[in-house]
């Protein structure tokens, strides 16, 4: 009989998952859930090599739909964006730490935001006037104002997309998501059994690029015997059932024997 190990950096969602799976019959003899970042995959079960590792890099719908977590600009809430609300600085605090050039670079590098310069300037101007950017709707209003130069017919969609990219960029920074993913990818082949498999679900191009590069490099080094040459995407039917699956990409790798 196998054993399932699961980790979640979010202690709130972790407990919900534990209760949900326990009600489905997954007791402690079958399931171990740890409050742990997957960058520490080598500490999940020291000395154990896994048959299969699945990493889901996305923010959950439960996190997005809770305005108190600050992941959405569609409802007002604190500008938090931390996956683990018990540690680290909030997105609001992070904004106050950055100068205009640093914020512009963050938006450009983490989410390819085309209006990074205008948004960064708008945020810093608020701080210079003694104002605050502490809530999700305050940031939304700033982005809306920064893009007011666009023609009215284009503005609504442009503001929506820039908000999505800006919140993504801040979330990546606040949670050190690229650094965490890099650490996980470096350790991954060393926790798999010979012939063991790994599958990783990504939700934006920056994540997918890191996974693709790591798998290819480790394949060349002989750590993997086979890797996905192309991403697997959700079917149109799945996207209709779950619109948030639309951006999902899956890549896999097989540990060398």
Description of each model-found segment:
Residues 1-257:
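S-adenosyl-L-methionine-dependent methyltransferase catalytic core, i.e., the SAM/SAH-binding region
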């Amino acid at each position: 009989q196998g054993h399932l190990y699961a980790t979640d950096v979010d202690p709130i969602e972790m407990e919900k998952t534990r209760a949900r799976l326990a009600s489905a019959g997954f007791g402690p003899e079958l399931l171990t859930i740890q409050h742990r970042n997957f960058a520490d995959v080598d500490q999940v079960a020291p000395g154990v090599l896994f048959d299969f590792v699945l990493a889901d890099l996305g923010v959950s719908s439960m996190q997005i739909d809770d305005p108190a977590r600050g992941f959405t600009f569609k409802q007002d809430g604190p500008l938090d964006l931390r996956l683990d609300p018990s540690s680290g600085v909030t997105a609001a605090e992070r904004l106050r730490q950055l100068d205009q050039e640093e914020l512009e670079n963050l938006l450009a590098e983490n989410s390819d935001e085309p209006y990074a310069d205008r948004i960064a300037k708008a945020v810093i101007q608020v701080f210079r006037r003694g104002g605050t950017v502490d809530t999700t709707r305050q940031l939304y209003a700033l982005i809306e104002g920064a893009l007011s130069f666009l023609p009215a017919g284009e503005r609504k969609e442009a503001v929506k997309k820039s908000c999505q990219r800006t919140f993504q960029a801040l979330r990546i920074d606040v949670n050190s998501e690229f650094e965490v993913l890099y650490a996980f990818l470096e350790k991954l082949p060393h926790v798999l059994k010979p012939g063991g498999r790994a599958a990783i679900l990504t939700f934006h191009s920056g994540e997918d690029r890191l996974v693709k590069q790591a798998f290819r490099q480790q394949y060349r080094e002989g750590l993997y015997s086979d890797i996905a040459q192309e991403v697997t995407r959700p079917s149109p039917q799945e996207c209709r059932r779950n619109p948030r699956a639309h951006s999902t990409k899956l890549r896999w790798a097989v540990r060398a024997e």
